[in-house]
Curated annotation (Swiss-Prot):
Name of the protein this chain belongs to: Cystatin-A1
Site (Reactive site): 10
Cellular compartments per GO CC: cytosol
The keyword Cytoplasm belongs to this UniProt entry's keyword annotation: yes
Highest taxon of source: Eukaryota
Species this chain originates from: Sus scrofa
Listed InterPro entries: Cystatin_dom (IPR000010), Cystatin_sf (IPR046350), Prot_inh_cystat_CS (IPR018073), Prot_inh_stefin (IPR001713)
């Protein structure tokens, strides 16, 4: 099976963030700021992995300034469900070299 195809439940290989991934990250930025009680001046999606579930989980590495990164998990429901994007998990105090993993 090619690495760029998604297997249900499996994580894809890490890929450079696209404008769509940046938009997803930006959409849940306020949810993350509320949960971490921090304001992120910089919020630049760098890379991502995705996972097909009953919708799609996006694991996104976000550069938040200096040497600081956060990993966010965003759930995108199936189109017919018409639900907003949900920040379903996050990891703070990450570095540029920390690998994105399922969490």
């Amino acid at each position: 099976m090619e690495s760029d195809k998604m297997m249900p439940g499996g994580l894809t290989e890490a890929r450079p963030a696209t404008p769509e991934i940046q938009e997803i990250a930006t959409t849940v930025k306020s949810q993350l700021e509320e949960k971490t009680n921090k304001t992120y001046e910089k919020f630049e999606a760098v890379e991502y992995k995705s996972q097909v579930v009953a919708g799609i989980n996006y694991y996104i590495k976000v550069h938040v300034g200096g040497n600081s990164y956060v990993h966010i998990k965003v759930f995108k429901s199936l189109p017919y469900q018409n639900k907003p994007l949900e920040l379903s998990g996050y990891q703070v105090d990450k570095t540029k070299d920390d690998e994105l993993t399922g969490f």
